[in-house]
Amino acid sequence: MHRSILLGATFLAFAVPATTVAGTFPDSHDPVPANWRGPVFRLSQQFPTVDPSKATPAPTYPWQQIDFHTKPAEYIKAVFDYVQEGNREVDWAVQSNAVRPWYHAPWMHSGDKGREFVRGLTRERFTPTPRPGETGELGPQQTVCAQNWAVGFLNAPGGYVLGQVWANPDAPDPLKALFPEGTVAAKLLFTAASLDQVPYLNDTLEWDANINTLTAGDTRCTTGTARSIQKVRLLQMDLAIRDKRATETGWVFATYSYDGSRGGAGWWERMVPVGVMWGNDPDLNQAAFDAGKRVTQSWINPDLRTPQHLGYLGRLNGPVDNPISSCLSCHMTAEVPARTNILPPTQRPPPAPVIDPMPWFRNMPAGNSLDQRSIGTDYNLQISNGIQNFQMWKQAKDGFVAPQPRPAAGPGPHAMPAPSAAAPAADDGQVLVVDGQRVYRVER
């Protein structure tokens, strides 16, 4: 595996003097009102200082005994249960989990999408208003746009990497973003859509959250900076697992969606897997799809009863995700600086044709970047976004604004080159391979 990065002027221009104190990353975008009596989000930031994956004996996980190629539903249920354990009991204040610790990525509080103070939710893609004659992405009852918000967290192996990336709070190091085996990332996604728009969300998990206040008649959910306490409902849960058996990418992604028509004593028993994905099916283009080919590096649950639009040509995606992308495709754009568009180029959302999307659906090994000039953050957008949020804040604070790199234009990201022969040893059990301005990280 190789990992391409740039150690040139573009990235180094972001260097700033140290001012902040380790372990004191902000919790939320907005201050807590003095009269607030509800929950208050606290960032879980006591990151492990020792890599749990290197413990003796080596840690084991319940899903490691299950082959996701042949038993995807069993595999992801084992991960789902692992994430639920101890978190439901503390209402997802993951720092208080008595079973195992979980951690939040720093610097997701910044900007107009930043973490709100009640639950730590950040603003996700809004679900657009359906066009005349089309069914809404959230179902046939959807007639208006809906804003969606989410909170993500990682288990101890992932938390260790967060701590390494942010060990110096004034100089976060994206080179440290390479997750060990057993890392699990999870995200709860909520929608502000009302029950008359999404009736299948009856009896789901409901939270109050300080989210954007929309103006009357706003059909596109364009938002300003004003926020207010509103009801949000759990619609989707995303999971990502670092698993070396996923030889295509190093990662297994999965999505659950809520179905109020299912039985069960609690909302978690009505969460249904949409599918499991370990590769991007790079040969599945429009011509192949039209000829009858379908995804082979994903499993899509045949027993879905709630509205699902899936991703490009049937690849895995969740109900609030963009239908022109996929779980893996979206996350493989995680890089610093962000030069690659998070979505493939398109004239407009489907059914209009997507223009040359296939560079976004290659199988990229863990730790690489789509653009050779950037540093990949191993499929983790919260690390890449957090670092760039921090850099923008520091530039504004210090009165310095560097030119921001534009996303890659034209046909798509650059191809990933092979590493050169030079190989000075690194101190992290890997090899750094120097090739001009680029440096590749290669597994021994």
Regions picked out by a protein language model, each given a short descriptive name:
Residues 1-8:
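Bacterial N-terminal signal peptides that target proteins for export
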Residues 22-329, 334-338, 344-444:
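Conserved small-residue
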Residues 5, 20-21:
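N-terminus-biased targeting/localization segments
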Residues 8-17:
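Bacterial N-terminal signal peptides
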